[in-house]
């Protein structure tokens, strides 16, 4: 069998043997110093294409065969060799290779059957629609890569004429008022399209699908005053909504960052080149699913982003979820994520350009005795919010959940959680807080050691001896604590659930103090109104299961159950890694109860 090394295979001697490096892997084959001499003979021959027998012959001894076989086996195991005999299409001629060296090297690096892919791309028909500043760089790149079946439809006929004539491309003139050609004007049916709507961003997927076969690939290029978005590459019904959502989200990020606009016409040229490369890679089957690019800044930076579910329809119906005493029969229990997993989920929500939330630096927010974190909305909603925790990692998770609650539509209690169970429990606790009954009212008095710094800070700020009310819901063994301060710049209130009195009091004290500290920072967002439920973050699976049963049993005794409607998938990133949405109490026959957590709950400072 004839083997050829994929491009970009490098090797070097190391003390343990020979180091090899490929596009996506690196490893060491251990052995004596002589092993490098063997590799130094074999690798150049493999780059040209050779057989095992020819490698052994080049080394001059049959005794070298085991070593040759070992090197070959290690390279094949890491997909660094092509078996030319197993390919469905033979390698192209020397003339074709000389004409398209970069494209062939790219396909040989990435594809299992590179020459079959290249042959298919050579016969692909691509329609490019939009301004010449965008289309010409894309057309040149695609033509240079071997995709020569190109039709350009542009209102800039004169600007495109010389290039299209030189490259032998088809050119269709568009009027200034048209962004798409008439289907009858196309000389050949396109297999894929690149579309830059320019000022006309209102073209529907239906209009584009009239030009393209069912499921044909589309790469959009969109502009905003500050940024440009390239991609995602997908059928028009997904790609157009996905790109519209991406450019809107990226524009809000750029505006919030006070970014300078991308320079023209350089930005158009780069956007076109990136769009052409994305179209080529997607047709070849080597682009990452949902790959897109955002161009921004005076220095014109292009950031690659990923759209997990391009163009997810915002109108998709969300399936209602119910908090039952136990998971449904056969349902796999979902353990709470680890702290690192929770932070990773928040990171997915706050990625620049694509995330609906932005984690702010918070340099002005106090960090003692509590850690305070702030997030800003990047989804067209209102402002920013702050949350507290004992340390930064938990505060990062807490503020993301707070922001998701702030974005919840009515009706119901706005709730969020790390899992479906956590989200429903969060909503139920918020609703049940209004039903909790006081059983003790006093000054806070003595507290556990971790709460003492909170009391000292309140006293230093002129708010000593806050009043405490302890409450219980008849069906729960959790405690609800309410702390009210007096003195200072204004009174503050903190309400918090806890697994016991101590935890609830600590949460209420911390909430009241965090309200005071946040209020003193100019420009900072507010601490969210409502009851603090972050004790759920520290409740393990068994504690959550016990609470779930208590809540479900208490609701059933009242002829109710708790129902949640999860947030729909995000139009940019797809399904969110955290749960959120409205939770409400409904009668067991399914009709919502009139009494829900008030949207106008009394502000707590």
Positions of predicted regions on the chain:
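Beta1/beta-strand and adjacent pyrophosphate-binding region of the FAD-binding site
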Residues: 124-128
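Aromatic pocket-lining residues of Rossmann-like dinucleotide-binding sites
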Residues: 142
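NAD(P)-binding Rossmann-fold cofactor-contacting core
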Residues: 149-169
């Amino acid at each position: 069998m004839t083997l050829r090394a994929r491009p970009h295979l490098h090797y070097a001697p190391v003390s343990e043997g020979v180091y090899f490096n490929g596009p996506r892997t690196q490893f060491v084959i251990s052995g004596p110093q002589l092993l490098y001499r063997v590799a130094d003979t074999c690798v150049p021959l493999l780059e040209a294409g050779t057989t095992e027998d020819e490698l052994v012959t080049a080394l001059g001894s049959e005794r070298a065969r085991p070593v040759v076989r070992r090197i070959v086996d290690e390279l094949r195991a890491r997909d660094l060799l092509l078996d030319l005999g197993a390919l469905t299409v033979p390698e192209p001629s020397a003339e074709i290779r000389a004409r398209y060296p970069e494209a062939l090297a790219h396909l040989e690096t990435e594809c299992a059957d590179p020459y079959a892919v290249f042959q298919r791309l050579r016969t692909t028909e691509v329609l490019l629609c939009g301004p010449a500043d965008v289309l010409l760089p894309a057309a040149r790149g695609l033509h240079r890569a071997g995709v020569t079946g190109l039709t350009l439809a542009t209102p800039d006929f004169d600007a495109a004429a010389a290039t299209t004539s030189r490259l032998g491309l088809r050119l269709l003139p568009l009027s200034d008022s048209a962004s798409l050609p008439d289907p009858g004007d196309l000389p050949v049916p396109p297999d894929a399209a690149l579309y830059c709507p320019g000022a006309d961003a209102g073209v529907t997927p239906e209009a584009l699908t009239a030009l393209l076969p069912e499921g044909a690939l589309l790469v959009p290029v969109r502009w905003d005053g500050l940024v440009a978005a390239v991609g995602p590459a997908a059928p028009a019904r997904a790609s157009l909504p996905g790109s519209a959502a991406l450019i809107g989200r990226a524009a809000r990020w750029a505006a919030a960052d006070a970014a300078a606009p991308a320079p023209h016409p350089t930005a158009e040229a780069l956007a076109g080149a990136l769009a052409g490369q994305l179209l080529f890679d997607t047709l070849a089957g080597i682009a990452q699913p949902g790959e897109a690019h955002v161009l921004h800044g005076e220095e014109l930076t292009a950031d690659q982003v990923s759209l997990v579910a391009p163009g997810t329809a915002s109108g998709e119906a969300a399936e209602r979820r119910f908090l039952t005493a136990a998971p449904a029969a056969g349902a796999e229990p979902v353990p709470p994520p680890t702290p690192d997993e929770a932070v990773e989920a928040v990171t997915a929500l706050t990625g620049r350009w694509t995330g609906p939330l932005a984690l702010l630096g918070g340099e002005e927010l106090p960090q003692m005795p509590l850690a305070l974190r702030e997030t800003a909305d990047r989804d067209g909603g209102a402002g920013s919010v702050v949350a507290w925790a004992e340390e930064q990692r938990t505060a990062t998770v807490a503020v993301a959940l707070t922001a998701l609650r702030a974005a919840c539509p009515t009706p119901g209690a706005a709730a969020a959680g790390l899992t479906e169970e956590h989200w429903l429990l969060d909503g139920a606790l918020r609703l049940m807080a209004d039903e909790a009954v006081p059983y003790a009212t006093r000054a806070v008095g003595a507290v556990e050691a971790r709460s003492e710094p909170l009391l000292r800070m309140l006293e230093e700020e002129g708010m000593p001896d806050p009043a405490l009310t302890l409450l219980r819901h008849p069906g729960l063994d959790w405690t609800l604590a309410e702390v009210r301060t007096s003195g200072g710049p204004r009174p503050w209130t903190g309400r918090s659930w806890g697994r016991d009195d101590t935890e609830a009091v600590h949460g209420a004290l911390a909430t009241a103090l965090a309200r005071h500290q946040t209020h003193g920072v100019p420009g900072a967002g507010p601490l969210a109104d409502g009851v603090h439920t972050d004790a759920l973050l520290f409740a393990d699976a068994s504690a959550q299961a016990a609470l779930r049963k208590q809540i479900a049993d208490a609701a059933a005794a009242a002829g109710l159950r708790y129902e949640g409607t999860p947030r729909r998938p995000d139009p940019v990133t797809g399904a969110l890694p955290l749960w959120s949405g409205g939770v409400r109490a409904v009668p067991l026959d399914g009709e919502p109860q009139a009494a829900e957590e008030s949207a106008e709950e009394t502000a707590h400072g």
